């Protein structure tokens, strides 16, 4: 009884006074007016959806959250996730269903890496709660006890074109969130006093994230529009806007505003500006090792170089070899399970405000499921690093469902994305360290088969710089490869040399940016003939990248070897041969060109 009374007393003390409550109501109405004016001026936008959440936003920003208005990127500020990347909002989530995953990454970073007081708030629409990625995020947050995370479900029942099946069945939303292990609070989203109460309750919860299920109405406060269908995404007609604004203004009782609470300044000072390779790669020329394993070893080494390096994996760590990082840095490894969309979103959240250097690992084929998150990461100008293993038909017996043959096309389409395609363990280690230090998204494509060491430990690598690894004055054709096909090109060069035919062989190292200058100069030195060979479909891969790079050179011809057709299960060597990218097929291509 005493505990209950104490709890009630605490709740009473947390209540704002009547003047503060009125200011919060007035600020909500000002937000409605701003949304109407802004969308009318731009002839685009969502004033109706904004109106449903106005009280939620007013209470959050002017009563609950702690932040410095003049310093929106301050690491101690509370975080808020909505739909656009503004100065205060760290990630773009305009395509629905992604915000909560990013919020999970921010909350995980705050709780486990920063060990700081800042909290994370994410506004989730009832419409987007139909996206599976939302439920991946709900499961993740519960599993990791993210009690510094609050998700606010804006349940206004209306969709873009109709009504949701659940409409205002608030109890169903409540039960679903509770089933996923969340502390769930139901509230009238129009009642600022009730909102203040539930957000206070959320702050008291330990070891569980909190879901606030708020019953709201689209178009709240707008006559003939509130809770009406077919208004989504439409500005108010300009001939009605002035009258609506005057009506809302008549409900405002004060000109006062509220200042947000100052943040608690307890985030650690960190430095991720330059992470140096502490020693050269430790490999011998006689070593044989898969680039996927070399990548895992490189991540562990990188983790020793900087304690803000983290690794995420989607339950493939014993195949991607990210488990090596986990063994050496267990407190900085995040298991995301089979939920690739959420894994990428969590990584996006972890790297915001420069708090971590994150690498997310899985099979390259599985990253295609997260293309939506990757695309929005590009729009957010994120610094995440993605590692895709088991690329191409060279993975062998696992079959076509596991073979990434579209991933280069996918990542080449992302603005400012750097694509590494290392061909041996030494270049892989350099790719990892380079990715850790460059701004923008990075993708590292690794292979399953064990391959020989090509480079010496002293070799240096740069982004956008290809390597000419076989050349002579007698070279007839330039062969461009990367990863497994580079080794096939070297084997073809060895066999052809016995016939007195010399090939020039180029290792791209980075597919994007492409070293066009090196490719063009070497092609001109070998009669203008280029053969590209890749473990990827023809569309969007190395061949098309090289063709685009030399397209303005009239005397250069590109011959393209790639995987044509749906692959099958088999031995790696058999599949390379079956799909026309083995050393034998390179030799045949050379012979055909020279016969002409």
Swiss-Prot record:
Gene3D superfamilies: 3.40.50.920, 3.40.50.970. Mg(2+) binds at residues 126, 156, 158. NCBIfam families: PRK05899.2-5. PROSITE patterns: TRANSKETOLASE_2. Catalyzes the transfer of a two-carbon ketol group from a ketose donor to an aldose acceptor, via a covalent intermediate with the cofactor thiamine pyrophosphate. InterPro entries: THDP-binding, Transketo_C/PFOR_II, Transketolase-like, Transketolase-like_Pyr-bd, Transketolase_BS, Transketolase_C, Transketolase_N. It is an enzyme of class 2 (transferase). Keywords: Calcium, Cytoplasm, Magnesium, Metal-binding, Thiamine pyrophosphate, Transferase. The record marks 46, 232 as: Important for catalytic activity. It is found in: Cytoplasm. Its cofactor is Mg(2+); Ca(2+); Mn(2+); Co(2+). GO terms for cellular component: cytoplasm. This is Transketolase-like protein 1. The keyword Protein transport does not apply. Binds 1 Mg(2+) ion per subunit. Can also utilize other divalent metal cations, such as Ca(2+), Mn(2+) and Co(2+). Binds 1 thiamine pyrophosphate per subunit. It holds the Pfam family Transketolase_C. SUPFAM superfamilies: Thiamin diphosphate-binding fold (THDP-binding), TK C-terminal domain-like. Homodimer. The active site is at residue 340. It comes from the Eukaryota. It catalyses: D-sedoheptulose 7-phosphate + D-glyceraldehyde 3-phosphate = aldehydo-D-ribose 5-phosphate + D-xylulose 5-phosphate. Substrate binds at residues 46, 232, 292, 319, 390, 398, 448.
